[in-house]
Amino acid sequence: MRRVPVLLLTLALTGLLPPPADACTTFCLRKDATAVFGKNYDWHFDDGLVVVNKRGVTKTAALPLPARAAKWTSKYGSVTFNQFGREFPNGGLNEAGLALDLMWLESTRYPTPADRPAVDVLEWAQYQLDNYATVDEVVRNAGNLGIVSDGKVHFLVCDKGRSCATVEFLDGRPVVHTGAALPAPALANHTYEELLRFQ
C-alpha cells in the first residue's frame, strides 16, 4: 500500500524536471603554439556526413532565384560535417588551417541579397572554407554575399595563426567580435554580447 503514494509522488516530481536543452557550444582553447577547436552539438537529429571538398571545383549556390546565385571556384580543399548534403556544412576545416562552425541564434537577421550574389547560410560557411585562409579575410568579406535562408545561425571562425572571430548577422548586417573584443573564443546559442554578460 505504501508503494502507491511513493509512485504517485515520483511521477508528479518527474513532471517538474526541466526539458533537455538544445544548447550547442563551440570553442577554441589556445595555449602557446597549440589550439584546439571543438564543439558539442545538441540538435533534433544526429545523422550527418563527413565530406571531403576538393580545391579547384566551380560551384553555384542552390537558390530559388538562380539569377542571384553566387558562383565561385574553391581555392582550398576542406573536410566538413554536413547534415543536409554536399556544400551545406555545419562546420569544417580547410587545408589552410581555417576552422569554422555554427550554432543556432534565434535573433539572426541576414543581409538581403539586393544587388549582391547570394547563398544559403550553410553555403556561406562552405564559401568561407573554399576561399579564405585567415580570420582577417573572413571578417573583411563577411558582408559581401546576400543570404537567403530560414536557418538562423552564427559562427565561430579560427585560423592556424590562432586568431578567432565570431560572425553574427543582426539587423541585416554582419556583427564581428575579434581581437580584444573576443576575450573568450567561444560561442553558444546567444549573441556574443549576451554571452559576455554571463561571466
Per-region residue spans from a language model:
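A contiguous strand-loop segment
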Residues: 23-117, 149-152
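Bacterial N-terminal signal peptides
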Residues: 6-16
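Sec/Tat signal peptide C-region and signal peptidase I cleavage site
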Residues: 17-23
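Accessory structured domains or lobes within enzymes
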Residues: 29, 126, 132-199
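Positively charged n-region of N-terminal signal peptides that target proteins for export
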Residues: 1-4
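Second-shell loop/turn segments in exported
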Residues: 111-115, 123-129
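Short, basic/low-complexity N-terminal boundary segments at the transition from targeting/disordered tails
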Residues: 15, 65-78, 128-141
